[in-house]
Amino acid sequence: MSRRRRPEKREILPDPKFGDQVLSKFMNNLMLDGKKAVAEGIVYTALDTVEAKAKTDPVQLFHDALNNIKPQVEVRSRRVGGATYQVPVEVRPERAQALAIRWMISAARGRPETTMAARLSGELMDAANNRGNAVKKREDAHRMAEANRAFSHYRW
């Protein structure tokens, strides 16, 4: 254990257009090489596209999509007597949100559309409707946890 005190959590400023902290965190994760203006442009263009297609509040749809991706349980490796077990553990809310953001971005980057904004809007629409690669990733995590339920007594 570290002897130093735990650093306090940094307050993330909400995004300038919608005033949403989670959206700001999403942009920070999407950003490459410190180019925040590019990341903002991608996210705002994607949200405009979603608004035009779905005729709903884009920020609400974004939150619905993230909630559909958030995992409740995941498996973590635990060594017990020379064997490594995949032990299912519950996911803390902060980690669930971080995983959902990460999975959403990686699923969007893997899509075939031409621009990143188009890929992201497509993945947002899919995730809001409980389909797409990001939702599949969450279901895989839940399936792994269910398959390894026998080892849940090794939790720490």
UniProtKB/Swiss-Prot annotation:
Coiled-coil features, chain-numbered ranges: none
Transmembrane segments: none
InterPro entries referenced in this protein's UniProt entry, alphabetically: Ribosomal_uS7, Ribosomal_uS7_bac/org-type, Ribosomal_uS7_CS, Ribosomal_uS7_dom, Ribosomal_uS7_dom_sf
GO molecular function: rRNA binding; structural constituent of ribosome; tRNA binding
Biological process annotations from GO: translation
Pfam families named in the record: Ribosomal_S7
A cellular component term, taken from the record's GO annotations: small ribosomal subunit
Keywords, sorted A to Z: Ribonucleoprotein, Ribosomal protein, RNA-binding, rRNA-binding, tRNA-binding
Segment forming the signal sequence: none
Subunit structure, as described in the record: Part of the 30S ribosomal subunit. Contacts proteins S9 and S11.
Record-stated family: Belongs to the universal ribosomal protein uS7 family.
Record's function text: One of the primary rRNA binding proteins, it binds directly to 16S rRNA where it nucleates assembly of the head domain of the 30S subunit. Is located at the subunit interface close to the decoding center, probably blocks exit of the E-site tRNA.
Protein name: Small ribosomal subunit protein uS7
